[in-house]
Amino acid sequence: MKENIESKNIGNRKFIIELRYEPKVTMLDSKGALVEKIQETRVFPCTHWEIGQSEVVIRDDKKKEDAHNVVLVTLNRMSFISYKVDSVESFYASFSKVYEAVTKVLSSLTITRIGCRIIGTYNTKSNDLRMFLRTFKIRFLLNFY
């Protein structure tokens, strides 16, 4: 996976990879094992985890709003979210470790959908929307196409 967005171009990045798969009912009996296996990956310091009726949430802070890394596993979905990304490669490597841990516990998954989002904020020097769009087009879009 090529690093196609330089860190200097994006501030406050949020990366999300989400897998949807056919429901794995065995997940209900394996929630504790999921937490342990994901913690063993050491992709981030797991300081807080929650086990709900049909989900496991692991994050690097007790307060949801202060967390930089979050893993969510449900009956039919796995999400890996990070606000602290050094590169696309490092994010994908961390996701791969978490995915491997999940499949060790739940065995094979029949994936029905995969999605990836990168959300970022951009500093502006003008309040004028037309000026902003022109600048955005010049600085951002033309650099990647």
List each model region and its residues.
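N-terminal low-complexity, intrinsically disordered segments
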Residues: 1-82
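Residue-level signal for secondary-structure boundary sites
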Residues: 25-27, 88, 124
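Short glycine-rich, low-complexity/disordered patches
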Residues: 44-57, 104-123, 144-145
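Charged/polar, solvent-exposed surface patches and flexible loops
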Residues: 33-40, 93, 97, 104, ...
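Aromatic/basic-lined ligand-recognition segments
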Residues: 1-5, 113-145
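Short, conserved acidic/polar surface loops in the N-terminal third of protein domains
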Residues: 69-71, 92, 127-128
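Generic ordered-secondary-structure signal
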Residues: 10-12, 74-77, 96-98, 121-125, ...
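Aromatic- and glycine-enriched beta-alpha-beta binding-site module
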Residues: 74-120
